[in-house]
A protein has these predicted regions:
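Alpha-helical transmembrane segments in multi-pass integral membrane proteins
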Residues: 1-6, 12-35, 49-65, 87-99, ...
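Short alpha-helical catalytic segment bearing the HExxH-like zincin motif
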Residues: 7, 66, 137-141, 147, ...
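His/acidic/aromatic-lined binding-pocket segments of jelly-roll/cupin-type domains
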Residues: 39-42, 196
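Alpha-helical transmembrane segments of multi-pass membrane proteins
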Residues: 68-81, 154
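Hydrophobic alpha-helical segments with transmembrane-like composition
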Residues: 74, 119-172, 190-198, 205-209
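Hydrophobic alpha-helical transmembrane segments that constitute the membrane-spanning cores
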Residues: 80-88
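Short helix- or helix-capping micro-motifs
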Residues: 103-108
């Protein structure tokens, strides 16, 4: 069963990322925190994937069903975005060497930092350089690696063991971020340092799984998680107000991200429990426009940054005043991004998803 409130959270996540990438020049304090939208995506993905795997756990064709459905969901838009962007770069004579874009082709960008500009903290790239436009794909590498390693763990490990694995991941990732901290985002892009967000989402899936089995016994535990959310979310908000929104901060990358991911997990848990409820925040998550953005969030995330780079190149040829140029780049990028995302959804994604559900049925929609 599709949970509408989670579509709303996906919409918030992708809008936060777009705000961060498109409008850093606006005097809007919240735009500095938009990078946390990626963490919200990670927690949501951890929940979704683990929920699916728990539903498939006793299926004879567990791996075939899971991986085939994931491939049909993830690969078509991903490789279309990759192909179109590389083609544009080739036409403009800015393709670069195979080593620059091959990590995106094979999903291993988050296993190591392949771009020396990231290692040295230089995040300004030449317009339409391949690495720049494809930079956002690192997060999909993190998720794909998690899908690959987590499915066997859920299938073969006893529940206590994979719960212990989640705890180990939640402890290990911030520890690695602390030890590996470098202003060039070395710790920001790697799977090993970001796996805790996915683990938080997986923990929520495990809690929901047990809650459905014995809802009466979980009444007291639900109250505990409500009080935990009341405590943690304000602490996280105060922390970020004091520490600032930049990820180029040792304490933000460790303590801040930990608090943010835990807050997102608690919000997701509460949203699932209260799905369909009349609380104001729950109704806001069900807003039709926000769920619509959440529906196309995958393609919107894939294309928004490459199209921003393309818009920068096109508008830059007009030699407009700086502020007008920045606004023109952002508006053109936004229009193109939403047009492409909705076009892909209705023209390709939704059709593939319907075909997937017919050909590779699953107890839980993937």
């Amino acid at each position: 069963m599709r949970i509408k409130e989670l579509d709303g959270l996906r919409g918030i996540a992708v809008l936060a990322v777009i705000l961060y990438h498109y409008f850093p020049w606006l005097p809007i304090t919240g735009s500095a925190y938009g990078w946390l939208g990626v963490d919200l995506f990670f927690v949501l993905s951890g929940f979704l994937i683990t929920s699916i795997l728990l539903g498939l756990r006793e299926q004879e064709h567990y791996f075939t069903i899971f991986y085939s459905r994931r491939i049909l969901r993830i690969f078509p838009p991903y490789y279309l975005a990759l192909a179109v962007y590389i083609l544009v770069c080739a036409v403009l004579g800015r393709l670069g060497g195979f080593g620059l874009w091959s990590p995106y082709l094979f999903y291993y960008t988050s296993l190591y930092v392949h771009d020396p500009m990231q290692v040295h903290g230089v995040m300004q790239y030449p317009p339409l350089a391949v690495v720049h436009g494809l930079g956002v794909l690192w997060s999909l590498s993190v998720e794909e690696i998690y899908y690959t390693v987590w499915a066997p763990i859920v299938r073969f490990m006893k529940e206590k063991m994979f719960a212990a694995t989640l705890i180990a991941m939640i402890i290990a990732a911030p520890s690695l971020r602390w030890m590996w901290y470098y202003p060039g985002h070395l710790e920001y892009f790697t799977f090993y340092c970001r796996m805790d967000a996915l683990a938080y989402g997986s923990a929520v899936a495990l809690l929901i799984h047990h809650r459905r089995v014995s809802p009466v016994a979980w009444a007291g535990r639900d109250r505990f998680f409500d009080w935990l959310a009341v405590a943690v979310i304000p602490i996280a908000a105060v922390f970020f107000l004091i520490a600032g929104g930049s990820p180029d901060n040792h304490y933000v990358e460790t303590v801040g991200v930990l608090l943010a991911d835990l807050s997102f997990a608690l919000v997701i848990y509460a949203a699932i429990r209260r799905s369909g409820g009349n609380q104001l925040w729950v109704r806001l998550l069900r807003a039709r426009w926000l769920r619509s953005v959440g529906m196309v969030s995958y393609s919107l995330y894939l294309f928004h940054f490459p199209l921003l780079v393309v818009s920068h190149d096109l508008v830059g040829k007009l030699h407009l005043p700086r502020r007008v140029d920045a606004l023109g780049v952002d508006l053109l990028g936004l229009v193109l991004s939403f047009a492409v995302a909705y076009g892909l959804w209705y023209g390709m994604e939704s059709r593939i998803l319907r075909w997937k559900d017919r050909k590779v049925p699953s107890p839980a929609h993937a």
